[in-house]
């Protein structure tokens, strides 16, 4: 379980994240929303240990992140950054196989997991191709498969952090990606995902953290967070919020 308490992060004299406390629960997808510059990626950097908090702490299973060895942490915590750079002509399955480096589970088992993770990311048909020959959206799905393989099949005690995993994807693959994330959480893992699409967050997230100016505005269910007054205050956007006629989650329509 990953928990953050009273996080504050500064860059120079500017506070870029303040007063953030949260706990990622097993089986939960927590969405993070906010305008550009709200502190979403900074929060993810602090949660994975890439950025050090000036105040507050981040605990993984009750222990400070710094107390875990790299291998121990990698078996419990996987991170998909906003941009994943790779300039070598690895085959797709080799890229996904990098997620298995923290383990010694054997080639046969690793190959099975890589194939399963590629299928989960709707990227199985890309196997055998050069990573460099892929489109931006295809690369994004391959990297999703990599972090899924790192924690496969997903269980309580494991945490997946995703920074805008749908940013390069067409509408179909936005949904297949978040369906894969949802299924991963349903097997017991905790997931935090940064999104910009309000309706995707409403459909796939159990709770939503709304950030503005580096500070939390709300942390609650989609029904409680995605209200017209909150979205107007944070995004400057006039919206109608209705109930989805089939699924029951909020449906946000720009006026």
Curated annotation (Swiss-Prot):
Record organism: Pseudomonas fluorescens (strain Pf0-1)
Keywords of the record: ATP-binding, Cell inner membrane, Cell membrane, Membrane, Nucleotide-binding, Translocase, Transport
Record carries keyword Cell membrane: yes
Enzyme Commission (EC) number: 7.6.2.-
CDD domains on file: ABC_Iron-Siderophores_B12_Hemin
Molecular-function GO terms, alphabetical: ATP binding; ATP hydrolysis activity
Gene3D superfamilies named in the record: P-loop containing nucleotide triphosphate hydrolases
Function: Part of the ABC transporter complex HmuTUV involved in hemin import. Responsible for energy coupling to the transport system.
PROSITE patterns to which the protein is assigned, alphabetical: ABC_TRANSPORTER_2, HMUV
Oligomer and partners: The complex is composed of two ATP-binding proteins (HmuV), two transmembrane proteins (HmuU) and a solute-binding protein (HmuT).
Residues annotated as binding ATP: 34-41
Location of the ABC transporter domain: 2-238
InterPro entries reported in the protein's UniProt record: AAA+_ATPase, ABC_transporter-like_ATP-bd, P-loop_NTPase
Protein family: Belongs to the ABC transporter superfamily. Heme (hemin) importer (TC 3.A.1.14.5) family.
Protein name: Hemin import ATP-binding protein HmuV
Domain of life: Bacteria
Keyword Translocase part of the UniProt annotation: yes
Topological relation to the membrane, as annotated: Peripheral membrane protein
Transmembrane segments: none
One annotated Gene Ontology cellular component of this protein: plasma membrane
Localisation: Cell inner membrane
